[in-house]
Amino acid sequence: LYLPGISSAQQPTPMQTEPAQAPAPDDGQAESSSPKAEEVPLDKIRGLVEIFHKIKQDYVEEVSDEQLLEDAMKGMLAGLDPHSNYLDGKAYQGLQDSTSGEFGGLGIEVGVEDGFIKVIAPIDDTPAARAGIQAGDLIIRLDDTPVKGIGLNQAVKKMRGKAGAPIELTIVREGEEKPLTFSIVRDVIKIRSVKSRFLEPGFLYLRVAHFQSRTGEDFRDAIQKRIEENKKPLKGVVLDLRNNPGGVLGAAVAISDAFLDEGKIVYTEGRVKDSKLDFNAKPPDLVAGAPVVVLINEGSASASEIVAGALQDQKRAVIMGRESFGKGSVQTIFPMSNDSALKLTTARYYTPSGRSIQAEGILPDIV
């Protein structure tokens, strides 16, 4: 789940959410309201410098200054939580591409678990989904490279590449005695985040595969188009968020708001002032009170859980399926001056009733 960062860099962060219900943090022009910084531990920094010089002087192989410093930054962030990390220029560009809707690769959202790469969800209509990759799979090898300990950024770099280039994934799957091997051909991933159709006259099915910067607008357009096509009030709506790994906060707020006239959607809390946000619904309810069913599973994470949690707490929808993933933290993207970026967990989000989703997930009303 992404929020814009406060940065001295001139370019805007691509994760700007433009929420209508509450002000988002300023995009690079405001002074940070972070807590007063503690004194810099100079003795520890001296120790870090000593280690740096020892490696440069005595390590068995020559290592560049750039590599050492980048690894130090990655290590600093890796010790915080699985979602905070340093994004070099290539990784940062990849993140921008994924939130804008087109990039080259396999089409899976991944995280880290016990040093391995865990599949949060395959994205609809991508090579990974067609190959049979499932939410919860643990990737243990990419081609001939074991992934344990290589870090999320390196794993993502290896999975992305030119369309047409193959890669072999070795995974461990719950219920399978032996690791499974998948040979997948990379493709240009064009994420169509919103699909819609009528299940039968008056009953609308809406599929949201990912929350991107335009998803909220596309979602509202799809509803309006189908209502005009139906020529009568809708009788019911099915919102399918299964295997939706999340994305941009503003899109989750917009989709929740589409079904609500009023009330809280979500709020975030963190240590700094700018991380504390409230998002509230505004009229109208685009489907005019038609009954709503939301489908979720273990691959529904982050922004998907915001939508499901908001509609469940506001008693606006019945949640069906299986317990969701349980990612209740917010990452802010801070662009750096060298075309890299810092992805840092800055807040946790809570449903209208005050529930934290972190590590617990949304429990469906009907299993």
Q: Can you annotate each of these PLM segments?
A:
Residues 336-347:
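Short acidic, Pro/Gly- and aromatic-enriched capping/linker segments at domain boundaries
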Residues 71, 83-121:
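PDZ/PDZ-like peptide-tail recognition elements
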Residues 39-44, 48, 56-65, 118-121, ...:
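Cleft-lining beta-strand/loop regions that shape enzyme active-site pockets
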Residues 348, 353-367:
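Conserved functional hotspot residues or short segments at active or partner-binding sites
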Residues 2-86, 117:
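Terminal targeting/pro-maturation regions of precursor/exported proteins
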